[in-house]
């Protein structure tokens, strides 16, 4: 449904943007996929990752992800709590279509900072909002403003290497 009916291509779009932003990345030692779902988000990245961890709330989705052999370890639970308890440092943090289910991103970005270092890459998608901070939409998903995202990235010492607006999915047949 996600790929066929909604023309969903966010993981591949994010990977292309990431590749375009960096000349050569080599292989990442430790990567974490926040809201990994069925593994759709991690599949474009996993070949360049030595140790790949996926986190998701849905045990059913993690069962599907496990069958794809993308991740070395899967964690079932709340992303904020899982990140808070994580002991490893990650050089790549991925989150595709997860922050749309979280309004205030300050706590999760702070927890992401705790598992990263200066050289880490944090790549993610959000739905764009042209207002202040964030908004809960009729779809039940949140949109976040660029200024809000930039502010909490700055607070947590992340620099924006690239930012791009694109269509992630069709909504009722429209982009």
Language-model features: where?
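Class I SAM-dependent methyltransferase SAM/SAH-binding core
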Residues: 32, 38-82
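A conserved beta-strand element that flanks and buttresses the S-adenosyl-L-methionine
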Residues: 94
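Conserved S-adenosyl-L-methionine
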Residues: 158-168
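Hydrophobic adenine-recognition pocket in adenosine-nucleotide-binding enzymes
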Residues: 98
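Conserved beta-strand signature within the Rossmann-like core of class I S-adenosyl-L-methionine
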Residues: 119-127
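Conserved SAM-binding loop and adjacent beta-strand
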Residues: 2-16
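Acceptor-substrate binding/catalytic loop of class I
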Residues: 132-147
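A short glycine-rich, Lys/Arg-flanked "PGG" loop and its adjoining helix->strand segment in the class I
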Residues: 106-118
